[in-house]
């Protein structure tokens, strides 16, 4: 296979190397002694190179998985023998139209590099997942990501104006004009969250915004989780647009702050001073019953918001027979408090568990759980980790919650995909069969082929 690819692209773009994402179950397996094998990786220099590789793979029946920054936590690139990884890192060019606020970025563009380039021009993408320093534009799109300022800027699907995609047979579908169109459905949206199952995103057309003229953040605390969730719901249902709004449960509050008691809420407003000031006054009324903590919690959050880096995640999982993971789910406001109690009970039965709430909309928000523990042996730790996931996924089913908000599906959520999607899984299968009849694209996308 390597020889065929070298004949196709030359020797330089084809390498063998160890490739891992940040899926805790995969890292735990390696720690327990699972054999690590180098992957065959091809790194085309341009879109035509991607097209040639996929044409060849379709002809030869070789499985291909796109590779971005490797910051995924759900095992979407946990390949098996005989597969090919297609590294998109060479597609790293981008162009910023400061008049129309339109960005064209290759799939391999680093998220933080793009954001800093926009900031230099007084602009922002407004998309700040915690993986931003490592993640690529293509990966953010493929996993249907959401950022820390999503209540203000929207999720990745709200920022994508168009996509250029290479289909499994090598056809290049170029992005349409960025203006909204009613000439057929927005078919590029099929690829947002597809985890590389339908083809490979090679370029994105994205909506930028001007940096806000003013940002003002602070912290308050509530005696109960219910009171904090009620305040978040009131903020969103009054049509305010907070830049950031994050509520921590009692255990996570104790972890985040030595000053706050109860449940900490970090909230910020942004925009033109007159607009942000008006929103701040409405926030004052809604949060009047909470304990006021000033700007310190906001500043602390800003300083540490990207602290769970890829290397830190790996270091935390070095301890023998330990586990650490995150599960992000989402539900409507009426279900969130009961969902939280149910998931926490399942996770805490195996170890320690924390939760914060963010990505709020008028209908509900994301509940983001972090859990950790240890066991006498590696196998016992793996079993405890699996039980924790099962408990969380079953709780979502009981409370009408979605099992994944912004990390994607991959291998981690494979056992629960059919229950989550219902009849829509048949729609997925039909589209997949039409676009990829040879079935060469990422076999772990959306939990794997069925």
Model regions: which residues?
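N-terminal flexible segment immediately upstream of the FAD-binding catalytic core
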Residues: 1-55, 72-101, 250-256, 299-324, ...
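FAD-binding subdomain of flavoenzyme oxidoreductases
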Residues: 92-246
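C-terminal substrate-recognition/cap domain of FAD-linked oxidoreductases
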Residues: 17-29, 210, 216, 221, ...
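Activity-critical C-terminal alpha-helical subdomain
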Residues: 410-450
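Short, ordered loop/turn segments at secondary-structure junctions
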Residues: 68-71, 91, 130, 247-250, ...
């Amino acid at each position: 296979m390597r020889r065929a690819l070298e004949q196709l692209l030359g020797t330089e773009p084809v390498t063998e190397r160890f490739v891992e994402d940040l899926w805790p179950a995969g890292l735990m397996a390696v720690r327990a002694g699972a054999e690590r094998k180098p992957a065959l990786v091809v790194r085309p220099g341009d879109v035509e190179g991607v097209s040639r590789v996929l044409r060849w793979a379709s002809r030869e029946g070789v499985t291909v998985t796109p590779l971005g920054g490797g910051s995924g936590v759900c095992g979407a690139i946990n390949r098996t023998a005989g597969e090919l990884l297609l590294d998109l890192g060479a597609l790293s060019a981008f162009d910023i139209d400061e008049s129309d606020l339109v960005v064209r970025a290759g799939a391999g563009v680093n998220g933080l590099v793009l954001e800093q380039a926009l900031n230099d021009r007084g602009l922002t993408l407004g998309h700040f997942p915690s993986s931003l320093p490592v993640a690529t534009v293509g990966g953010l799109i493929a996993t249907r990501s959401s950022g820390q300022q999503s209540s203000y800027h929207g999720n990745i699907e709200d920022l994508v104006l168009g996509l250029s995609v290479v289909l499994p047979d090598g056809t290049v579908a170029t992005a349409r004009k960025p203006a909204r169109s009613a000439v057929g459905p927005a078919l590029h949206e099929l690829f947002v969250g597809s985890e590389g199952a339908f083809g490979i995103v090679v370029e994105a057309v994205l909506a930028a915004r001007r940096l806000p003229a003013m940002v003002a953040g602070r912290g308050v605390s509530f005696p109960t989780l219910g009171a904090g969730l009620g305040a978040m719901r009131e903020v969103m249902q009054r049509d305010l647009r907070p830049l950031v709004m994050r509520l921590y449960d009692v255990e996570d509050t104790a972890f985040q702050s030595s000053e706050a008691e109860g449940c900490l809420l970090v909230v910020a407003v942004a925009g033109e001073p007159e607009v942000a000031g008006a929103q701040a006054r409405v926030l004052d009324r809604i949060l009047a019953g909470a304990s006021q903590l000033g700007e310190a919690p906001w500043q602390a959050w800003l300083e540490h918001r990207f602290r769970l880096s890829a290397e830190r995640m790996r270091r935390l999982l070095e301890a023998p027979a330990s586990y650490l993971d995150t599960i992000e789910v989402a539900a409507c406001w009426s279900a969130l408090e009961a969902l939280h109690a149910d998931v926490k009970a399942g996770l805490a039965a195996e170890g320690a568990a924390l939760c914060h709430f963010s990505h709020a909309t008028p209908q509900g928000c994301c509940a983001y759980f972090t859990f950790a523990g240890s066991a006498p042996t590696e196998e016992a730790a793996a079993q405890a980790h699996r039980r924790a996931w099962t408990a969380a996924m079953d709780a979502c089913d009981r409370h009408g919650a979605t099992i994944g908000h912004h990390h994607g599906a991959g291998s981690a959520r494979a056992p629960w995909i059919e229950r989550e999607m219902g009849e829509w899984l048949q729609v997925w299968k039909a589209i997949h069969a039409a676009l990829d009849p040879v079935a060469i694209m990422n076999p772990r996308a959306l939990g794997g082929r069925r």
